[in-house]
Regions:
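Glycine-rich, flexible loop/turn motifs
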Residues: 1, 9, 18, 41-44, ...
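Arg/Lys-rich, positively charged N-terminal/basic patches that mediate binding to nucleic acids
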Residues: 1-32
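Short low-complexity stretches enriched in small and charged residues
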Residues: 32-33, 42
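Conserved phosphate-interacting/catalytic interface
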Residues: 36
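A short, surface-exposed loop/turn module that caps and links secondary-structure elements
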Residues: 40-64
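Enriched for short, Lys/Arg-rich terminal
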Residues: 54-57, 63-91
Length: 91
């Protein structure tokens, strides 16, 4: 379950509103948001290799990411649900 969003654009997309900067991959991003929202545990996300759920390090330590495509990631913190969810190009 998604508890909070760090990125207003990600929240807008989650509510099925058009976000220009996500044009071209909005369907894939929305699918990942739905998967994240439905996940009962972090382990459930990691159970599907296609999600490529991984713990981050460095200045993003404590966060996890799911790949949307080669460039964009769905980043979040996990504490009994997803929090501070954002869609970022952190490369």
């Amino acid at each position: 379950m998604i508890k909070s969003f760090k990125c207003k654009a990600a929240e807008k997309l989650y509510h099925r509103k058009f976000v220009r900067k996500f044009a071209g991959f909005e369907r894939a991003a929305l699918k990942r948001l739905e998967i994240l929202d439905a996940a009962p545990t972090l382990g459930a996300l990691a159970a599907f290799p296609g999600n490529r759920c991984e713990a981050l390090s460095g200045d993003r330590k404590g966060q996890y990411s799911i790949r949307i495509n080669k460039q964009w990631r769905l980043c979040f913190e996990w504490n009994e649900g997803a929090a501070e969810v954002e869609i970022v190009d952190y490369h």
